[in-house]
Amino acid sequence: MEERCESTESPQGQGRKNTKCGWLRKQGGFVKTWHTRWFVLKGDQLYYFKDEDETKPLGTIFLHGNKVIEHPCNEENPGKFLFDVVPGGERDRMTANHESYLLMASTQNDMEDWVKSIRRVIWGPFGGGIFGQKLEDTVRYEKRYGNRLAPMLVEQCVDFIRQRGLKEEGLFRLPGQANLVKELQDAFDCGEKPSFDSNTDVHTVASLLKLYLRELPEPVVPYAKYEDFLSCATLLSKEEEAGVKELMKQVKSLPVVNYNLLKYICRFLDEVQSYSGVNKMSAQNLATVFGPNILRPKVEDPLTIMEGTVVVQQLMSVMISKHDRLFPKDTEPQSKPQDGPNSNNNDGHKKATMGQLQNKENNNTKESPVRRCSWDKPESPQRSSVDNGSPTALSGSKTNSPRNSIHKLDISRSPPLMVKKNPAFNKGSGIVTNGSFSSSNAEGVEKPQTTPNGSLQARRTSSLKSSGTKMGTHSVQNGTVRMGILNTDTLGNSLNGRSMSWLPNGYVTLRDNKQKEPAGESGQHNRLSTYDNVHQQFSSMSLDDKHSVDSATWSTSSCEISLPENSNSCRSSTTTCPEQDFYVGNFEDPVLDGPPQDDLSHPGDYENKSDRRSVGGRSSRATSSSDNSETFVGNTSSNHSALHSLVSSLKQEMTKQKIEYESRIKSLEQRNLTLETEMLSLHDELDQERKKFTMIEIKMRNAERAKEDAEKRNDMLQKEMEQFFSTFGDLTVEPRRSERGNTIWIQ
């Protein structure tokens, strides 16, 4: 009753290859009678002919937009294997003719083959119909989701079994629930992506995986390679090493998609047999189960199957146990993140399991370079002079605090950052993209204050507002931005022994909870990261000419730094994050700032002042204006030109990006208008078709009524004719009788 037409061209093919052809019975007509027709599945259309040799089809069924429904066999209609091709499918799309077709096959297998073939045509463009689909076609479609070693169905089943079923006794040997396997198969064939949860039976998923491999049109090892692989098994029985080498040669000669799938399956089965003490599935048992699905002859006659069963089992067992030699791992260097002592990313790396490594290799993904943060210890001339002059004055310095350490940003290794707009930013503020930043007005203002003993100290007042990593306040010297870190969730760790207390007036005090270290080491952590294109020089600054960096915010996704338009140094703005608000006022570091130059000769006085600052909850900084002003003025011109050239180039880059994004937005809007116009036209056409359909229904009803009226008139005429003939017959018979009665006999 049914015939496959995949490799030959039928007379109805007109030069195109048919997917499937055979005899089916179709119900049609007003009286719903069954007609036997020759059906040909070609492309996305199903043709039916009166005879196999006919060239002109009686009709065509357009499959796209339809769906197939199987009718279960019942006791009322035994021997009828029915299925419907009805409108619907994805999002209930309507077909061109809005008709449904009831078809009947001769056997259950015949019906299932037709249903699978039709579903493959309907759902193939949407990723469905994968059961019975060619492996290369499935891989070609799924390339849009990334390169993979195996189809997504195989990956999903393997991942689920790896998580929940490796210790299940009788895995792959015990069958799953047939109805659940059928439901999952139908779901995948209809383009759906069903997910497995904790209630899903492991044996059902394992049966689904075996079913997919069994229903491939051509097995993982192609038919042309079947005899070559069997010869390898014969060689293995004689000389194992030579057999393994020959098997490696044959495996490498497989097509790429077949090689990748075989590699994926063998590695997974080796992982399964590693739990053989629990699941009772050794390599030999797994080879018995998977061998016929991986290696099978083209003609499956009983004699060939019996002869090749033992050989296939032996060969499959070798491929599982020696998969490391047969499928060498790709030696691709993968970057491993190296976190510094106070890196922004403090999460430790977890050891990946075998399944995770295999999925990484399957997805062909490499670990993207992560933004690095490292701390180095250059020595500041200013701090060195202070240490040499008064070792006891800075004995309590914190070498590991963010203010005293260098936060180096490896821009070359960081991934590109997306530009984000924040309405909370002031005009002129910008977002750093790959290390670039735009200018804006500074918020913080330096306020010189007088200490109790009469010495001047510069106090920086700013408000740090962020939910993530905070940047401390530092001065800019020679065009270099010094950035410290204040992280709200790792204050205790990042400050390494410096406690933080809040005062009623909003000030912040950093107290020393760590033992003092030698003065020679305390001067090695005083500057922060510098840009490579700006030379770092340390010199004293005067109080009047000093411009400090109030605050800056650093996160793993964006960095925002603002510059004053007419200033000699960089001043950063703050960033607002929606998660939480964190304010810091009058932030100072007495250890980094150091004592006033006038008080270096009296270490004891400086210690007393430090104690008073600690008790009062404040820290201050004082610098000498007479010694630092001349040096700073000398470096102002070079800093000014370097920073403004950088700002101008970054502004140009942001302008280009803005133009590009605007053009993209306009093109998308234009495309949206075009699609809306097309949608309106399609809606109009749909309404017209519906009106036509309604008119045709009305005409059909009128025709049926006219037919009924004609039949009634015919009946009436028939009765009238019968009455007329009966009456006419009576009239002709009576005169004859009277004539006979009046006859005169003459003798």
Swiss-Prot record:
Phosphothreonine modified-residue sites: T451
Domain PH stretches: 17-123
GO cellular component labels: adherens junction; cell projection; cytoplasm; cytoskeleton; focal adhesion
Recorded coiled-coil stretches: 648-728
Biased amino acid composition, Polar residues: 334-346, 355-367, 381-404, 431-475, 630-639
Entry's localization field: Cytoplasm, Cytoskeleton; Cell junction, Adherens junction; Cell junction, Focal adhesion; Cell projection
Keyword GTP-binding annotated: no
Biased composition (Low complexity): 616-629
Region span, Disordered: 1-20, 327-475, 581-639
Purpose of the protein: Rho GTPase-activating protein involved in cell polarity, cell morphology and cytoskeletal organization. Acts as a GTPase activator for the Rac-type GTPase by converting it to an inactive GDP-bound state. Controls actin remodeling by inactivating Rac downstream of Rho leading to suppress leading edge protrusion and promotes cell retraction to achieve cellular polarity. Able to suppress RAC1 and CDC42 activity in vitro. Overexpression induces cell rounding with partial or complete disruption of actin stress fibers and formation of membrane ruffles, lamellipodia, and filopodia.
Subunit structure: Interacts with FLNA.
Stored PANTHER family: RHO GTPASE-ACTIVATING PROTEIN 24, SPERMATHECAL PHYSIOLOGY VARIANT
Protein name according to UniProt: Rho GTPase-activating protein 24
Record organism: Mus musculus
Source taxonomy: Eukaryota, Metazoa, Chordata, Craniata, Vertebrata
Gene name of the record: Arhgap24
